[in-house]
């Protein structure tokens, strides 16, 4: 994603041909969503504890996000579109919506251009938690196929952003979302299984309403993203013997074929302007490329990966948050005017990557790691203060529907309501 926003294709003599047939942004985010779908439900189920899962997520994401916002606001001049928090004229609405990380489905500008993917992550977390507390979490295949099928049939007819088409409607929607999210978290962090289930179903219900009725992106793209995430979960379950492999390949195959068909049917005739790529060919090749990369990584999962790659994985979240603000900060000093010779282009690329990786490492080392450690301490304190109650309620599968079951084995807007930003729903 860093190289995509850096504009690496513009520096290559054949970059235009690549752009016509392949979108690095869509490739990157779909690969990211596949990985997330594979990892996140496994993390929740290994813990077998909704509260522990959410404490870990909150301390994993929010400190780095807040620090990245603070650093970016200090670095960037007013008017720079990559960071818009406190710069929209509706600062309270913007802050509240971005605090929930649902802003991209609340008709509110993303506080940072790249954080639209965090909205999809948060919605996925809500859905996964709701399914888990009902004992429906192993129905990943059915859910993935359902999302893909709805995208196929209704991808060009369902309207997006239907709940908030004015500033007043947006304000009301944000207030409602904040209240629901706060109530949901209070319940999920209580340690009481019945309350945890109520909280999980509250936020999962909100997630479903937003993704079907108020997505900023075209509906076919939104639904395909969630089909992809749950397909990632299907692969995890097949790998660990929780579902039949034939069923898994059928489900995943349907999602992949649907993604290509969706691109051909809907991502053309001007619609590609809203998905930020050149058309259905680039859409389809990028989507299938993400799947091919993920499956190749799965085949190599038992191999020992080089340390530089594992290190890059560790700092990837910080790099994702910082790479655009850093680019906008250093480009006027190091690449103005833009380099024209091959040597100068190479030097500029190396300089940008080096600065970005150093900054990402510092954010990871100084913010991410300490707050993850603090999160573990906070969880222990919560468990001492509010011990988890016994699991209750009917359900299916090994969880019995409880909020703490036994663990299983092992990123067109209405005028005046939003401010345009650089990153679109397929650019990361």
For the regions a language model picked out, list residue spans one by one.
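Membrane-interface helix-loop-helix regions
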Residues: 15, 61-126, 139, 149-163, ...
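Membrane-interface junctions at the ends of membrane-embedded or membrane-associated helices
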Residues: 43-52, 134-142, 191, 236-249, ...
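Alpha-helical transmembrane segments of multi-pass integral membrane proteins
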Residues: 26, 221-237, 249-369
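Transmembrane alpha-helical segments and their boundary/interface "anchor" motifs
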Residues: 26-30, 43-82, 89-97, 124-125, ...
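Aromatic-anchored segments of alpha-helical transmembrane domains
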Residues: 2-5, 147-162, 203-215, 253-268
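Membrane-proximal cytoplasmic C-terminal regulatory module of class A 7TM GPCRs
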Residues: 332, 337, 369-409, 413, ...
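Functionally critical transmembrane alpha-helices in membrane proteins and complexes, commonly lining
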Residues: 1-44, 59-65, 69, 289-293, ...
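Interfacial loop-to-helix transition and helix-capping segments at the boundaries
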Residues: 16-29, 108-120, 159-180, 190-201, ...
